[in-house]
Amino acid sequence: MTISFEGRVAIVTGAGGGLGRAYALELAKRGAKVVVNDLGASRDGSGHSDAAAAVVAEIAAAGGTAMADGGSVTDAAAMQAMADRAKAAWGGVHILINNAGILRDKSFAKMELADFRAVIDVHLNGAANCTKAVWGTMQEQGYGRILMTSSSTGLYGNFGQANYAAAKAGLAGLARTLALEGARHGIRVNTIAPTAATRMTEELFPPDMLGLFRPELVAPAALFLVSDDAPTGAIIGAGAGVVQAAHVTLTRGVRLAEPTPEAVAAQFAAIDDRAGEIVPQTGAEQAMTTLQRLQGN
């Protein structure tokens, strides 16, 4: 089976370099018309460049179709204008990859709240702005594919990245809820947690390992997650050719005869026992497990 994007219109944010560029190039190579969005900022969000135009030129040189957009994902009106321009030019918007992001890493004790809010605003609020801009069109089409970019930091935590972790965890939760809301409209929403050497992460990898973590090795998983046959609600880790699935699990837990702090302490090992754990598909399903325990199941 060959995955094709002929006839599809895709928007990729943060596509002036790194992962976004890799996604945009591969989508265009496989037939999609691509909006390459990038503010052209440095990894902390400062400055501007013509990074988006450079990627559009690469796509055009390879025979593809693309347009550049330099709007900030933090500007809801600019993102709506971008989506409207794509729809006017190409007849719709079928794919959105929310990839734009910044880093302002510090331990929480040393972090200014302005830096906490700035990272949340780009990653989480920016993704919400872009998704809101295309959601109505996707509903009308009866078709949409949206990919959120989370991180191992958002799923598992990482020292010195409280702002980034909060944003990335929020994106995973947003994607799960939108997967439920979009299902009846043919909209599928997934999350990718990439491991790649980009301008945002290159300092984390030893120089001799950078080649193993090329952004191009994350792109296959990302493109599958926005393809016709994509699942919905999945959280997929990808990097260096390794693809994994992440799940939020729930233990069977314990019904306490007397719910007191002391009882929780005494039973904590049993509460935390992962034998027989489950993966609820919705928040409501998690609540039902409590009811089932009350009923003795």
Tell me what each language-model feature is.
Residues T191, M209-G296:
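C-terminal helical subdomain
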Residues S49, A53, G70-A81, L113:
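The beta1-alpha1 cofactor-binding region of Rossmann-like NAD(H)/NADP(H)-dependent oxidoreductases
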Residues T131, A167:
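Active-site helix of classical SDR
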Residues I59, S107-F108, D115-I120:
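Substrate-binding pocket helix/loop in short-chain dehydrogenase/reductase
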Residues I3-V36:
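Canonical Rossmann dinucleotide-binding motif of NAD(H)/NADP(H)-dependent dehydrogenases/reductases
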Residues S4-E6, A62-T65, R85-N98, R104-S107, ...:
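A glycine-rich helix->loop->beta "capping" turn
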